[in-house]
């Protein structure tokens, strides 16, 4: 098992190095499911420990750096833009909406504030220390966190006209080669995109045919497709549990 683990590790590292060396700016560091704007909130809210007063102060020291973090992210995005790489239009729409939501939070509503004080309220600290944390985090959100999100939002708005009209990575500079690398990473094969596509079509046809054999043998309508029949099965009351508490 150690030999297999080693081979997997080497495979992953080689693919990662290939991407870093040949496609360093083909990723989308801001998108609708992940990115710096998500990571800051999730790390600070869910992972950063606040088990004592010292850690609470450390939390605020880090929120003071959010604007710097996003400034660094902007430098990366500008280098990506210099290569002619922009995220697809639908990504822009989601990101701008998400950033506007984060910008429009008041301090009392901000997830960094609310999650932080859920933890602080469990600490045995004096009222003066509690008040100090409250004032400092409010100031940090106002001077670092929100301005950082504004930086990202303004960049996305200013470059939206250049957003990629296509969704596929193939449409980016040297995108076909990057796509081949991602296929290799995901499938662990050296198949071409065309071969992978044809395998997919073949497997869908094979599985659908076998499903139809089973469904028609059970008396289901053979004139309908496997997909239609599966949807009907999912909605058949006789095959569903009742909506009860038990």
Where are these predicted regions, by residue range?
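N-terminal maturation segment of proteins
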Residues: 1-246
């Amino acid at each position: 098992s150690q030999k297999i683990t080693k081979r997997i590790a080497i495979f992953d590292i080689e693919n990662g190095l290939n991407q870093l060396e040949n496609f360093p700016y083909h990723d989308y560091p801001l998108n609708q499911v992940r990115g710096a704007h998500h990571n800051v909130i999730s790390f600070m809210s869910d992972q950063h420990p606040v088990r004592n007063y010292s850690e609470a102060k450390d939390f605020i020291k880090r929120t003071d750096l959010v604007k710097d973090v996003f400034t660094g992210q902007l430098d990366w995005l500008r280098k990506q833009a210099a290569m002619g790489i922009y995220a697809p239009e639908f990504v822009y729409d989601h990101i701008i909406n998400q950033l506007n939501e984060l910008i429009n939070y008041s301090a009392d509503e901000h997830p960094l504030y609310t999650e932080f004080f859920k933890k602080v309220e469990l600490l045995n600290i004096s009222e003066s220390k509690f008040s100090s944390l409250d004032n400092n985090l409010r100031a940090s959100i106002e001077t670092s966190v929100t301005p950082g999100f504004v930086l990202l939002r303004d960049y996305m708005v200013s470059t939206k006209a250049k957003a990629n009209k296509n969704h596929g990575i193939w449409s980016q500079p040297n995108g076909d080669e990057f796509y081949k690398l991602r296929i290799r990473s995901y499938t662990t094969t050296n198949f071409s995109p065309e071969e992978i596509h044809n395998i997919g079509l073949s497997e869908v046809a094979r599985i659908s045919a076998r499903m139809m054999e089973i469904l028609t043998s059970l008396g289901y309508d053979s004139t309908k497709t496997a997909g239609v029949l599966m949807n009907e099965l999912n909605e058949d009351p006789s095959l569903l549990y009742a909506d009860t508490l038990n």
